[in-house]
Amino acid sequence: MTSERSKRRKIAEVVSKLFQESSTLNIQNQDVYPYSSNMFFDSSYLHGIREQVDSNLEPNEFLTNSNYSNNSLAVMETEISEIENNKNTIELLTDDSNEWSPESFISDDYKSDKSNDSEKLPHKLANWALSFNITYAALNSLLPLLREYGLSLPKDSRTLLHTPQNIDTKIVAGGEYYYFSMQYWLLIMFKNNSIESNNNQLTIHINIDGIPIFTSSSTSLWPILGTLIEAGAIVFPIAIYCGDKKPNSIHEYLEDFLVEIKALTENGFTHENVKYDVKLAAVICDAPARAFVKCIKGHNGYNCCERCVQKGEWCGKIILPHTSATLRTDSDFRYQNSLEHHIGVSPLIELGFDMISKFPLDYMHLVCLGVVRRIINLWLNGPRSCKLSQNTVNILSDRFFQIRCYIPKEFSRKPRSLSDFRHWKATELRLFLIYTGPVVLKGLLEPKFYSNFLDLSVAIRILLCPILLKNYIGLARQLLTYFVQSFGKLYGKDQLVYNVHFLIHLADDAVNFGVLDKCSSFKYENYLGQLKKLVHRPQQPCSQIVRRIFEGCLKEDRHHIHQLKFSIQHVDGPITIALRHCLQFKNYQGFKCFVSATDGNNYFEVAKKIGLVRNIIQIKTGESCDGLVMFEEFAALESFFTDPLSSNNLSIFYASKMTGINKIYPLSDINIKYLQIPYKSGFIVMRQLHL
């Protein structure tokens, strides 16, 4: 007969074995209980439980307590025997069981949160895939791995992304074509509360331009893009066209668009019983696309000017040397009074649309990629009369390198060497023209060349700033005309090409549309680059783009939406004694701009004083957090130049001395951001127009 001690030892061995098997089962069944095994079976965790049990029991109480009779031990022996005979049938305890299980330690709120997270996971994963342009193949490889861990996800990426099965493209004007419609996007923007229209007016700008898709083939993309002024800078595709060349018929290409825009302008657009008047206000294109849409001579023709009746001259190339020719009118265009200017009849005439003033000249292509790049090329590769020495070029490149750390966060590209100027993007050329050029060129260019460049820089700055535009539009027009006249004298008559000539007409667009950024191609060029990235293989590029666009409708739109955020905590000060208990930060992302206490993003106008932010302080007011800045203003601001007008009037100053006094202001008082560039023993500070 088995002794009492043997029975106790046998019970202890079986319990220990069962515990080990339970641990193994939980690890092997993570798809049933997707919680960390360490969370429930960590040795330190178990040791803690055992200590709690031991503290409540006397030594050997569990086995020696007189309440446990021989009958109880007999029952336990029977149970042990049954368990040993049915080891393979052990199952994890269910939620309905009153026995111990890992989930018994999890609160209902935690389970609910986990359930909600699992429901949101497919949407979050889809948003991630779209944000980073993840291919179908990569996503199809990831999904099975995640499903192995019990995550409720579809097997195929197309199900996750809600990819349309059939895309009904058609052949139009020699290429594959798909039309979305403007009403589709208007409904989406209303649904997302993106539209702010106080007068029930919807104003549409469209853009037409081409971009090659591949480097090894002639396949190109010619979309019709749109923006709604009342919705800000949101770009939406109206139609997608892919072909081996540009559309072979402008009438076929624009047919669907013309039908819809006619209906919208005549009948308006109704949403939630509110009728909105729809107006097509501008068609924004570069020079070749404008000639294509308007059916006129291209930029290399004798009668290429869209704004004035001037016949070009041959000087090794077509030039337009005159600055006072008769201006064209919409009536002249419709009746084709200058037949040599036209090569056909534009379908846009049907809209009653002003064919002269409603086609802005797009300063991105005209000024930045056209005139500024031409000027730099003349300095580097032009005739000896204007060519810079290699030593001067090296000094300029060194200056660009030295000021890189002072360029604010809002500028995606920093200055780089002049040897790379042929690869400079439009944003880099704009940065050079408006901000860095007038400073780094000072003292290196001959005065006559520097003065000519400064005339262009000042004129464009005026046309980009609402306040300056209101006060100095006449001066900007005069400066641009004078620039064109002096440009021919300085660099040669043969340099008065299409882009240079059109500067005399640029101020008219600022009068019609406001600052030039409102009618430029910058946002459209950025969107074109995004469309190009949607093509993952050479077959059926149009269908690929359309599918990806429909998938992208699921994506959370975070464009130009900044969360208020303090970052990079420190204890370096400066800070007042009264605020010493508050948290200090280096950076703050606000709605208006990025604020920092480090070089490049710390020059601002606060309470009509210009200076620099020394520290950012977070204070708690109830449940919310507000911010303060330690701000030190300049002791004096001087003019950087006086011709063609005082730089003070343009918010450009030379500053060398600080007051040495730190003052406290609310973050909300920060009004205007300034860009700083080292110059002599101080800095040139200038108002930042692009945020």
Which residues fall in each region the model found?
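E2/UBC-UEV (E2-variant) core
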Residues: 222-272, 310, 314-361, 621-691
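Terminal interaction-prone segments of large eukaryotic proteins
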Residues: 52, 56-58, 63-75, 79-87, ...
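Short, conserved catalytic/metal-binding motifs centered on acidic residues
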Residues: 142, 209, 257, 283, ...
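Electropositive nucleic-acid engagement tracts
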Residues: 115-201, 548-549
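Generic preference for well-ordered alpha-helical elements
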Residues: 118-122, 135-139, 179, 201-204, ...
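Domain-level detector for long, ordered catalytic/regulatory cores in large eukaryotic signaling
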Residues: 148-151, 163, 266-426, 440, ...
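Acidic, metal-ligating active-site segments
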Residues: 184-188, 195-197, 202-243, 439, ...
